[in-house]
Curated annotation (Swiss-Prot):
It holds the Pfam family GFO_IDH_MocA. This is Glycosyl hydrolase family 109 protein 2. Keywords: Glycosidase, Hydrolase, NAD. It comes from Phocaeicola vulgatus (strain ATCC 8482 / DSM 1447 / JCM 5826 / CCUG 4940 / NBRC 14291 / NCTC 11154) (Bacteroides vulgatus). GO terms for molecular function: hydrolase activity, acting on glycosyl bonds; nucleotide binding. Substrate binds at Y174, Y208, P209, T210, H211, Y290. InterPro entries: Gfo/Idh/MocA-like_OxRdtase_N, Gfo/Idh/MocA_oxidrdct_glycsds, Glyco_hydro_109_C, NAD(P)-bd_dom_sf.
Length: 413
C-alpha cells in the first residue's frame, strides 16, 4: 500500500498555538524574543541544559508580561517536554546534530515541529523526518528565513507571473566572513571549542546549504513540478582559518596549528529533472563581502541581489534597469508577504523583517489550518546537500544522485 504523502498537508486550526522552545542559546533566545511580538501564541515550555539560558528566557517572558512557562533543564528532559499534551508546536534551536532526533520524537508525540537550519545532517536523517511526518500527519517546517527576504520574494512573484520567462539556471550561496568567530568565545557568539568548529575539522563539502538553496528551489518549483536529480561538488583546499590564526595568534600558536577538513570554498552544481541547473556556494573563511547570490536566469530576463540588486528584462534592452524604472518594477512586483507582513514588522521596529515574516506565516498557517509555506520535503531536499556534497568531494567530484523524497509525487504538482 502506497504511503500517503504530506504535500499540501492541512491540520485542524489551532486558535492559540502553544509552543515549547528547546535550545535557548544565541539563536533560540532571539527566536523567543521575536515571538513576544506575535498574536495567538503562548509559550508553554522552555528547555535548555544551561540554567542561565533558562533564566534569560524567563526574564524575557516577564518583561513582556507573558505567563510563566514550565522549564526543563536536565539531560534528556526535552523528551518529557515533547510528551506534554498542552504543547502544539516544538520549536528546535539546538545544535545541528540533534535537530533530527528531537524533531522525530516530537512528531511521534503528535506535535508539530519547527526546526532551525539545517534540518538534518545526513540523508538517512532526512528520510527519518519525511517518514515520520508522513506517518504522523504532522507539520515539520525547517526555519529557512532567507525564503522571506524581500528581494527573494519579489523574484518569486516575478517568476510565477512569467516576467522572467522560462527559468533555466539559478544561483545561491552562503558567503559570510566568520573567521573571527571560529576563535571567539561562545558567550561572545563565537565557535571556539564549539560544535560548529568541530564539524569543520571533521567534514568537508557544504554543511550549510539551505540559505542559498531555499529561495532557488522555490523559484524552480522543486518537488512541485520539478526535482533535483544529481549534483557534482568540489572544494578548495583549506587555508583561510590557518592564515587568520597565524596572523592573529602567531604562527606557532595552538590556534594556527589546528587542522580542518572543510575547504575554504565549496562549489556545488545541481541538475534538475527538467534540465535546469543550480550553482550553490559556501564560504565562511575568506575576506569576501557577504553574499547569498540570489541569481536567476530566464529566457526573458535576469535578476540578482548580490553584490548589488540587478534586474535586466529583454523588453527593456541590454542594460539593467536603473533609477525610477528599477524601483517601479520592484514596487509593482512586491510580494504580498513583504507588502503586508513586512510593513507590520517595520511598524513594530523589528530588527529583521524576513524573520518576522517567517514567524508570522508559520503561526498564521497553524492558526488557520493552512498548508505551511515550507514542508518536510523542502527540509529534506535542501538539507541532504550537506552529506551528498561531502560524498562527491571525497570521491573526486563524481556525480551523486539526490533522493526523491516525494517518492514520485513531485510530478503531480
Amino acid at each position: 500500500m502506497k504511503r500517503p504523502n504530506v504535500l499540501n498537508l492541512t491540520c485542524p486550526a489551532i486558535p492559540v498555538v502553544r509552543i515549547g522552545f528547546v535550545g535557548l542559546g544565541n539563536r533560540g533566545i532571539l527566536a523567543l524574543e521575536r515571538y513576544m511580538h506575535l498574536e495567538g501564541i503562548e509559550v508553554k515550555a522552555l528547555c535548555d541544559l544551561r540554567k542561565e539560558n533558562i533564566e534569560r528566557a524567563e526574564h524575557i517572558l516577564r518583561e513582556f508580561g507573558r505567563p510563566e512557562a514550565e522549564n526543563y533543564s536536565e539531560e534528556g528532559m526535552w523528551r518529557k517536554m515533547c510528551e506534554c499534551k498542552e504543547i502544539d508546536l516544538i520549536y528546535i534551536c539546538t545544535d545541528w546534530l540533534t535537530h533530527t532526533d528531537i524533531a522525530v520524537y516530537a512528531l511521534q508525540q503528535g506535535r508539530h515541529v519547527a526546526l532551525e537550519v539545517p534540518a538534518a545532517m545526513s540523508v538517512a536523517d532526512c528520510w527519518r523526518l519525511v517518514d515520520t511526518a508522513e506517518e504522523t500527519r504532522r507539520h515539520c517546517m525547517m526555519l529557512e528565513n532567507c525564503c522571506y527576504d524581500a528581494f527573494a520574494l519579489t523574484t518569486l512573484n516575478m517568476v510565477q507571473q512569467g516576467v522572467l520567462g522560462e527559468i533555466t539556471h539559478a544561483e545561491g550561496a552562503y558567503i559570510h566572513d566568520l573567521r573571527k568567530h571560529y576563535f571567539a568565545d561562545e558567550k561572545a557568539g563565537g565557535y571556539h571549542n564549539h560544535w560548529i568548529k568541530l564539524y569543520s575539522q571533521q567534514h568537508t563539502g557544504n554543511p550549510y546549504p539551505t540559505h542559498g538553496l531555499g529561495p532557488v528551489c522555490q523559484w524552480m518549483n522543486i518537488h512541485r513540478g520539478d526535482r533535483m536529480e544529481y549534483l557534482v561538488s568540489m572544494s578548495s583546499r583549506q587555508a583561510g582559518l590557518s592564515a587568520y590564526a597565524g596572523q592573529v595568534f602567531g604562527a606557532s600558536s595552538e590556534e594556527a596549528a589546528q587542522s580542518y577538513e572543510m575547504g575554504d570554498v565549496n562549489t556545488t552544481l545541481i541538475h534538475t529533472a527538467k534540465g535546469r541547473t543550480i550553482l550553490l556556494q559556501y564560504d565562511v573563511t575568506t575576506p569576501r563581502p557577504y553574499s547569498r547570490h540570489q541569481t536567476v536566469c530566464g529566457t526573458k530576463g535576469f535578476m540578482q541581489k548580490y553584490p548589488v540588486p540587478c534586474l535586466l528584462l529583454d523588453e527593456y534592452g541590454k542594460e539593467p534597469l536603473s533609477g525610477e524604472q528599477f524601483e517601479r518594477m520592484m514596487e509593482q512586483y512586491k510580494h504580498p508577504f513583504t507588502a503586508v507582513i513586512g510593513e507590520e514588522a517595520r511598524r513594530k521596529n523589528m530588527p529583521n523583517e524576513m524573520n518576522y515574516i517567517m514567524d508570522y506565516r508559520l503561526i498564521h498557517c497553524l492558526r488557520n489550518g493552512l498548508p505551511l509555506d515550507q514542508d518536510v520535503y523542502d527540509a529534506a531536499e535542501w538539507s541532504c546537500i550537506t552529506e551528498l556534497s561531502e560524498r562527491s568531494v571525497r570521491q573526486g567530484s563524481v556525480p551523486v544522485e539526490i533522493p526523491d523524497f516525494t517518492r514520485g509525487n513531485w510530478k503531480e504538482r
